[in-house]
Amino acid sequence: MSVYDVAIVGAGPGGLYTAICEAKRGLKCVIIEKRKDISKMTRYCSEHIILEEMYNGDTITVDVGAKLDKKGEIPEGTRNVIKSTHYGWEVEYVGPLCPVRDKYYYSAKLEHNAHYAWPDKHPFAWKYDKASFLQQLLNQVIELGIEYISETTCYEARDLGGSEGVLLKCVTKGKRFQMKAKKLVEASGASAQVAQTLGMNEGRIYFASALTRAYYMSGVKGYNPAEWCGYWGLCYGSNFAPLMGTGPAGHYDWADLILIGHPAQMPQGLFEHFTQKSPVAHMFENAKVEREHSCMTKAFAPMKVPYKGNVLVIGDAAAFVETQMQGALNCGQWAAEALEKELDGKPGFDEYTKTWQETFEFNDDGMMQVQSGYALIPYYSDEQVVYLFSLLDDVILPGSWSQYASPRMMWNAIHKHDERIQKERPDVWDKIMNQQGKTLSDSMSQ
């Protein structure tokens, strides 16, 4: 039976970067990955580098290796460097980039919107090629001599306690085998399947299951790859706002239409309504679906303490939905530091936990209240959302990608009109006063 210092389940950015950082510290590690080829995206992902200052505890910058081309993009083959201002890591990314400069949240019938942008229009995010980036990280893993086992599922993990380490039971192409490691890093993504076998998901609040389908479409009228748009109102067919943003690498001229449903509102039905019956149906008269991706995400409250015994859970596996690529890289660096200390008999996992809790916004106890900023539909009627968004006319909010900062900004701007709302629309004011208990699960269960 093979024995390692560290076993890592999952070859996403967090797992790969953990291995890279560990190998540079002289640790013997192995990565177990269920996919055959990580350079091919089989599950939908937004693929953005977020540039907001102190977004999830860090400010990311990108040293772009070329000027924008005639299409307003950074071309394929460009050497770029992604940098963490707060934690100090640098990672090279060779590939295309497309800037995101404006975000619009539209009310019913496109009458009003919440607009996020910087005055000089500098980007608050870059669309990148995640599949290519993962392959580049894997190339580093292989160059460092780290063992990488693909097409393999870890179906059970057992913490043997103390110095005995962890026993992993795996299967590849119908053949079962076992291995041992002194420490285990669970980096399998939002499904957190290994954590589940260890009972580490017990006690996490379950919010909802989101069925997400993305349609990459050519020929969408009015589409701008530098814009990210959300459409709020039942007239658009969904309780959860349809989103439209930048298409995939190599096809930034395609729109990325994202529809989030649940068993009572399946994505295909939402697609048909949005593209054929909604106020924006005219945009799709000559559009063509070029490619589709989907995923199912179970939204759980984050793990406040993401370790147990010899097992550390990192990245999306411990998060509320996702940490984004940059957050996963941070987790990878912290994990490597923690593992080195743990193997030296020091409390590295405690230090990781402290950093985890302080860094990611979703660990704030007020997260449920922030969620309510997005629970507009069906709590508010379409007409009431139109009224609320009308209060934002002639207002441009700071450029923001954050799913936590954006609703705060929007509601702060709306609350500047509290006296007006109370006078003009007592019905809306009553709902605002009672909104705190509304969450995403309310929107997605109706």
Place the predicted regions along the sequence by residue.
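N-terminal Rossmann-like FAD-binding beta1-loop-alpha1 element of flavoenzymes
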Residues: 3-31
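C-terminal auxiliary extensions adjacent to catalytic cores
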Residues: 376-446
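N-terminal FAD cofactor-binding segment of flavoenzymes
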Residues: 21, 25, 34-104
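Conserved acidic E/D residue at the C-terminus of a beta-strand in Rossmann-like folds
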Residues: 31-36, 316
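FAD/FMN-dependent oxidoreductases across multiple families
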Residues: 125, 263-335, 342-354, 358
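Active-site-proximal substrate-binding core of FAD-dependent oxidoreductases
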Residues: 337-384
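Short beta-strand to alpha-helix junction loop
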Residues: 118-140, 193, 264-269
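Predominantly flavin-linked oxidoreductase catalytic cores and closely associated redox partners
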Residues: 140-280, 319
